[in-house]
Amino acid sequence: MTNIRKSHPLAKIINESFIDLPAPSNISAWWNFGSLLGVCLIIQILTGLFLAMHYTSDTMTAFSSVTHICRDVNYGWIIRYIHANGASMFFICLFMHVGRGVYYGSFTFTETWNIGILLMFTVMATAFMGYVLPWGQMSFWGATVITNLLSAIPYVGTNLVEWIWGGFSVDKATLTRFFAFHFILPFIISALAAVHLLFLHETGSNNPSGVVSDSDKIPFHPYYTIKDILGLLLLILVLMLLVLFSPDLLGDPNNYIPANPLNTPPHIKPEWYFLFAYAILRSIPNKLGGVLALVLSILILAIVPLLHTSKQRSMMFRPLSQCLFWLLVADLLTLTWIGGQPVEHPFITIGQLASILYFSIFLILMPISGIIENRLLKW
């Protein structure tokens, strides 16, 4: 008699995805982040669901409903802070996951990679809308500034912004629709993640060496289920340390002030995980140019496979490319720092130099280093 997990139509899909899946024998801890992103998504959907039971998406009551959740709802404070800091953990895992893809050449699976980029945009949109919902000062002004960027689009810009706002400014209609979108998007992300996995399982996983590992595969369970559980425990440890000891560490104090359209905060900035893109946006004096640079800062990942000149897939044995990769990481950290600073000297200049370096690494330096490494190996 065949095992039910191999014969039942539904169990068979789960079995082929998480149990009997052939996996390379040498994948490192950098391959944990995919499953951690799945866990983060589940945590966010569950905590978000419980928050939505008590939240009201009305400009008059949104702020006080969040206060009510923290003060009066049983364990409401911990649900709220797990959700807020869970978003930060989500983005940490996301950046690590993308970084691993760039370092080890996983972008050569173009379908999986492109779905991943689409997922990244969707997650960023969801996080942005979620930041608006508590209706604090930074929520309101963040929504105003970021949506206003669309007005830079020629001809249709102003109409598009007013259409998104549902009026002539960020108001009740905006908050209501942002709540609706924030609720539905995680389910769209879940569907996209399933497609992401579908394409990945067509090719099989990459591995640190970048060499095809078809001749050396091991079953996903128990080897990588155990390995993923270790990553999961570390994720939960870091998340709970954040939630229980310093829940507001990554937030903005201005968001504890109710939204006031008549009073602009001294320095409007998004959450920390958007600061690198925000710094790139601000480094260009022209509004349309800034918006294009903002979009391209993520979209540039789509042309990484096209600009891959090396005959080796992974950077594991390419010291020159490794130096450029870590320069890129340092550059992103610099941009994140600059995004949180006021627009004044010397931060403007540092931001502009860091932005130029960011695009140069992807468009010029990485392809050149690939060609040089090929020559050094006489390929």
Curated annotation (Swiss-Prot):
Annotated compartments: Mitochondrion inner membrane
Alphabetic keyword roster: Electron transport, Heme, Iron, Membrane, Metal-binding, Mitochondrion, Mitochondrion inner membrane, Respiratory chain, Transmembrane, Transmembrane helix, Transport, Ubiquinone
SUPFAM superfamilies attached to this UniProt entry: a domain/subunit of cytochrome bc1 complex (Ubiquinol-cytochrome c reductase), Transmembrane di-heme cytochromes
Membrane topology value: Multi-pass membrane protein
Keyword Zinc assigned: no
Single GO molecular function: ubiquinol-cytochrome-c reductase activity
Cofactor binding note: Binds 2 heme b groups non-covalently.
Function: Component of the ubiquinol-cytochrome c reductase complex (complex III or cytochrome b-c1 complex) that is part of the mitochondrial respiratory chain. The b-c1 complex mediates electron transfer from ubiquinol to cytochrome c. Contributes to the generation of a proton gradient across the mitochondrial membrane that is then used for ATP synthesis.
Protein name listed in UniProt: Cytochrome b
Lineage per the UniProt record: Eukaryota, Metazoa, Chordata, Craniata, Vertebrata
Gene this chain is encoded by: MT-CYB
